[in-house]
Structures are given as C-alpha cells and as structure tokens.
Amino acid sequence: VLNEPSVVAMNSFNSKIISVGKDAKKILGRTPGNIIAKKPLKDGVVADFNSTEKIISYLLRKTLGKSLIRPEVLICVPSQITQVQRRAVIQAAKYAGAYNTYLIEEPLAAAIGSGIDVTDARGNIVVDIGGGTTDVAVISMGGIVINKSIPVAGDEFDKRIQDFVQTKYNMIIGESTAEKVKINVGSAYPRDDGELYEIKGRNLVNGLPMHIYVSSKDISV
C-alpha cells in the first residue's frame, strides 16, 4: 500500500516541483525562502489544480513505474462537494494520466475499508475525520442515507496545537511536529496514563532551540 501525504514542495522563483509526498512534508513549515511547501487540497477539494495534478502523476508513476497502460483511478472525495469540484478532481486525474476516474464519497469508502457490510439494510453511522474535512454519514443498502460534511479536521487540529504551543510556551513548531503531537497524545478526552511527550521547537523570543513536555490533558479537545 502506497501511503503519501498530499504535499508538494516547489521553487518559488520558477514554480518547479522539487519533491512530492513524504519528502515534501518533511520541510512543510520550515522551508528556506526559495522553497514553498504547500497542500494543494483545501477542505478536501482542489485548491491548486497544477499541484494536484503533479501529486496524482507522482503517485501513478510510483505505483505503475514506466507502464504504458493508462490506469483507472478511484478517488475519495468529501460527501458534499459540488459538481464543479468533482469535475476539477476528475480533470486533474485525467491530465495526470488516468484513463478513467471514478469518485466515491469518503464515508462510504471508510465504511468499506472498516469491513462494514454497506449493503445491509440496517443503518451504520460513520465518522470520517480526514485532513481537510470531517464527514458524518448514515450508510444503508449500499448508499448514503444522510450526511454532513464540515471543513474542520486533522489539519485544523494541527494548527490549533501550533497555536497552543506558541501562546503558552512561546515556542514555534512546524506542522509535521504538531501532527506528531496529535498522533501521540491527542485525545478527545484527557487520558489518565500520565504519558508525557517531548516537543522540540524554536523559542519565539530569542530564536534558540528549546523543548517542552506535554500530556494528553494539554492536547485534548
């Protein structure tokens, strides 16, 4: 399974793509002036067409190698995106080399991936927290009965962690560091395990390296 974040790093002078995926994410939030690391998907939809195309093209090349066969592609999208946004995703995949592109709503894909029998008449509630959107849906008989998509998800959690660390400790951390904090000690409810997680960053006042320790009580919703 190929697992790559939707991040690109490019030269700010000529817009040339330097790296994609994990390599680009490593420098997200801490790039020198001539390199820009960005996420071309905003709230689960295409915000930068060219960069989105580059990401899809990169993933296809990494998966298929130098194959001359144009693949069929299935892409997950938020459940409430517009027809215009759907067409933008399909066009980006087409320009990247896909022969046919099919879209599936993220809650339905999450249910299938979790082993839920989506064809069952009994309804199942699925909450899919992605990077840009959180989708909540009731799934029954192979489809979505009712759903709601909100533009608050993992990316916003990371931003809130960055803001918290900067406000409380006068320390600046990058998006990748904030995500690691979220994964390791983030919790909807404070845990009582007493686990502490070390965060390394840069002092906001003097610019020197520093570190702090936080617990799930600090990072809980």
Language-model segment annotations:
Residues 132:
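Conserved Rossmann-like nucleotide-cofactor binding loop
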